[in-house]
Amino acid sequence: MHTEDNGLKKEIGLLFALTLVIGTIIGSGVFMKPGAVLAYSGDSKMALFAWLLGGILTLAGGLTIAEIGTQIPKTGGLYTYLEEVYGEFWGFLCGWVQIIIYGPAIIGALGLYFGSLMANLFGWGSGLSKVIGIIAVLFLCVINIIGTKYGGFVQTLTTIGKLIPIACIIVFGLWKGDQHIFTAVNESISDMNFGAAILATLFAYDGWILLAALGGEMKNPEKLLPRAMTGGLLIVTAIYIFINFALLHILSANEIVTLGENATSTAATMLFGSIGGKLISVGIIVSIFGCLNGKVLSFPRVSFAMAERKQLPFAEKLSHVHPSFRTPWIAISFQIALALIMMLISNPDKLSEISIFMIYIFYVMAFFAVFILRKRAKGEKRAYSVPLYPFMPILAIAGSFFVLGSTLITDTMSCGLSILIGLAGLPVYYGMKKRKAS
């Protein structure tokens, strides 16, 4: 097993890790996606099956990464795993895409979305939405610099906060609803494509792997990582299935498809009156804020880990740990600075979508890594073994290939741009390698 002492405080326990998994996955998708998944599925049975299948594929990936993470319990997650298994080149490319485009783009997109929702809720006008988003990102930057435990407190609080409206809809929807759950969607409003339905659920489940980036700050990663990954993904899968059951008990399948992104707020209004719509709006805002905090907490650990290995310019600065807070404060500031630039001059949401193709290539490589590590350490005792081996890793690989294939067919240009983003890091990689050699 590979361990490290990077000077960061080991403050992450099971509750923090669980809320990080749940909080970084559940954003707006649980409120916005049911209509789209139902439209693609054609009927409620297939829609519920799509949510279940998406959860199973994600769980397979999570359990596979948990085995790798217990063998390489280091800060950096996916980047670190690829470097340890495939070498410095592939690790660098993975880290490059995450820190230059993917991470800051997701932080920026969530910040802008949060600002827009806050402005709409309080009637402040769209002109203030970007300012609110920037303030939120800066606030979370400061919180996570002054202590990982404070970021963890925000994560726990927002996870509980987002689960309250979800729980209300599930409980009261199943209790008070009077619709037949298993119904079909009219062909005139359906767009039958079960593959697209699964793809929509997989994107709604995305974000779970960010827990792995904090391996070096866990109190006992060998036990904690698999427990948090398994528990968190099972909870999220159950939430997604139950809220769809509840919606189908309140609204007909046709109504959910027709209402689209407004289906959940309409269902809440039917259950709780005019306050119901506000409840959902607040739930989405808290959800986005918690998701944003999880990204601010975890993405900078990749640039910190790369800087520790002298793979980035200004590595000495980026790998600096604050003497009092014991957090990678310069790495956090660097990632937030990139996110703020994207918020000001571009469309971060589109940038994150463009880079997703390369990220899934790295997912496939990480899932294959479990076979390589087992071969290297044949006969050695493992702290954790993925259950149903080799079925689970193969299932995870199949799910990732499905995402890659679907994305390649539906958005070929974005896939090409994604590859170019990865290749753009090559001059930096060879430049830093030459500098280290000299």
From Swiss-Prot:
The chain crosses the membrane at residues 12-32, 46-66, 99-119, 127-147, 152-172, 194-214, 231-251, 270-290, 328-348, 353-373, 389-409, 412-432. Changing C168S: Retains 25% of the transport activity. GO terms for cellular component: plasma membrane. GO terms for molecular function: L-amino acid transmembrane transporter activity. Changing C291S: Retains 25% of the transport activity. It is a multi-pass membrane protein. Changing C415S: Retains 25% of the transport activity. GO terms for biological process: amino acid transmembrane transport. Keywords: Amino-acid transport, Cell membrane, Membrane, Transmembrane, Transmembrane helix, Transport. Residues 33-45, 120-126, 173-193, 252-269, 349-352, 410-411 are extracellular. Residues 1-11, 67-98, 148-151, 215-230, 291-327, 374-388, 433-438 are cytoplasmic. It is found in: Cell membrane. Belongs to the amino acid-polyamine-organocation (APC) superfamily. L-type amino acid transporter (LAT) (TC 2.A.3.8) family. Monomer. Exhibits an obligate exchange activity for serine, threonine and aromatic amino acids. This is Serine/threonine exchanger SteT. It comes from Bacillus subtilis (strain 168).
